[in-house]
C-alpha cells in the first residue's frame, strides 16, 4: 500500500520512511555509474527480511550504517550471501525489535501504529547496538558523508530514482566515487543498483526529512 505524501497528510506522516511499498523495480534514471572509489558501505536487501520487508528500509539502513561504521551487528552476514535477498533477514528483524517497531518474541507483530519508521526509531536501535546516532539536518548529513562519515538520509524515493512514486525512504551514504558523487547504498534497490553515486544536488532535490550520522 502506498500512502501519498500530499498536503492532506500530516507533517509527522511525511517525515516517515515507508520503504519500497508499491514502487516498481528499476535502476533509477538519475543514478550515475556504479561507484568506483573505496567505501565501507555494504549492500543489504530489505526485501525478504520478514513479514514487514516492504517497509523495512529503516531497520535495514540501520544495519548497513552500523556495519559501515565498524560496529558489530549480531547475526550480520557479509559478502554475496548477505547481500542476496533474505541474506540478512535475521539481523534486520532483530534491528526492528531494537528500534521498537516489533516485539523481540514475534517479528510478525508490530508495536507501532504506522507504516515504516522514523529516524528517531532508527537512532534508538543504533544506540541499543552500542552505536552513536547524531540527528542532523539533511545538508549537514550530505557534508558529513562527503568527508567519510556514515549517514542515514531520509529521501523521497520517487525523486531519488526519477520514478512515479510518492513516499519517504531511507538510504545510507558514505564517501564519494571517482566522479565526486556521494556513494549511496539503497536497501530498496539492493539487487538492481546496490551502491551508486549521486550528485549532491540530486540528493538535495530528493530530500524528504533529516539525516542521522552514525559512528
Language-model features, listed with the residues they occupy:
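Active-site-adjacent structural segments surrounding the nucleophilic cysteine of cysteine proteases
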Residues: 2-112, 157, 164, 178, ...
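Conserved active-site-adjacent core of cysteine acyl-enzyme catalytic domains
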Residues: 83-215
